[in-house]
């Protein structure tokens, strides 16, 4: 139980009109620490109690069991709590030094499954910065949900089906060079894809030709299938190389093509339940009662199925296969309407578990304010970007620590971590402008800044030969250490907030605050000097390092021991 929960619990025992949860939401942190550590405003009770807030505050302060606190005083309409810093710091440091990386572990999920649909790049197209967001947000959410007791199933729903394969087949047959594709598959396929789209703008017959080749593919034409399989295999080799660089793993690569033989069953269920209506030759499900104006288009007039039919098949398969407690789709916010339709159709089909489906949208990555587009060839490719980030990180590491061993390995952890962290510190629904120089900076609110704070603490602990197992009683009550203690104590709540809001940026911002607070402490405190507080200061440094490393791990970012 953290301090705010303790206060809320104590107040709930003497306030009849508010429960603990409501009180917790009302608690504030005073701007001036002389006014206490936490304050409860009594305004909300004035109407019910029919008393002035000042009088209520005075009565509450007198009734509080102040043994848990240094003192409890009423100041105007506020009840101000002054915490026993020594006792709380001892308790927090003891918990972290004992539990280590398991500090803040919880069992909220009771080992139930969370399915995370993430990354999902299109086959035969390069892995760009645009795909990065879904990949790193999904990966971070997986770590966060595991931390609070869920098991996760990471699904890479590959874009390995659709009209674009018709376009690619036409382009390859017109202009493709087998040897060139074998040598540089994605580069060559991208050139072909950009060219066919550019030419199709002036020649509509290319579109029709592409549709025809896709129809052949759907009907199992041997040549079409062989080309499709080749494009898929070559793309996957490249994707897996990049996933290895990012240290992201998946439990399933079942993409769109996997559901080709599962969509008829969906159409049959919809038909049996009398949910299909005919509209201009197409089959649709009316969703007006859910406030959704446009019906869900299940089957086109030419008999072709659509994305939503495939996603319905995928949802049914995943529920049956994994019995999920939550099913999360980490997909751009431009798909919001699609996921509203998906949930509504599942609800119409009578599946209560449609409530367990959540679309986790995210904003766009731009470059100099402009939208990126594979089709137009305006794209930032991930592989050269990672290489450049690693190179920039190495230059800075060499300047700071020329004698450092394993520079290449550490530069890789810093460069990749910088890209991931910059993405994840951004509020998920906001976009951001891609700026590699800002990402890899060791100053400011960046991954390298947090990693460097961690490495600095490790250096201090090595010099002191600190062993948490042999440490004794800790007690700190100075202002700088108290700021750190409060953050560390808050870590479990931070993790819960990140999970509840599907928002890794909450963890990233916490990591920045903790690194900043420690750096401030380091600047004002001689940690290694012999003094009565030396062990406590080292324990505080150790606890900060444990929590920083764990926060970075939850973001999928490594924490090098030396930089």
From Swiss-Prot:
- What reaction is this protein's catalytic activity? tRNA(Arg) + L-arginine + ATP = L-arginyl-tRNA(Arg) + AMP + diphosphate
What is the protein's species of origin?
A: Streptococcus pneumoniae serotype 19F (strain G54)
What would be one Gene Ontology cellular-component term for the protein?
cytoplasm
Q: Where in the cell is it found?
A: Cytoplasm
| Single GO BP term | arginyl-tRNA aminoacylation
Q: Does the keyword Disulfide bond apply?
A: no
Family named by the database record: Belongs to the class-I aminoacyl-tRNA synthetase family.
- Per UniProt, the short sequence motif 'HIGH' region occupies residue numbers 121-131
UniProt GO molecular function: arginine-tRNA ligase activity; ATP binding
Q: Which domain of life is it from?
A: Bacteria
Q: What is its EC number?
A: 6.1.1.19
Q: What is this protein called?
A: Arginine--tRNA ligase
Q: Which UniProt keywords apply?
A: Aminoacyl-tRNA synthetase, ATP-binding, Cytoplasm, Ligase, Nucleotide-binding, Protein biosynthesis
The UniProt entry, under Pfam families, shows: Arg_tRNA_synt_N, DALR_1, tRNA-synt_1d
Q: How does it assemble?
A: Monomer.
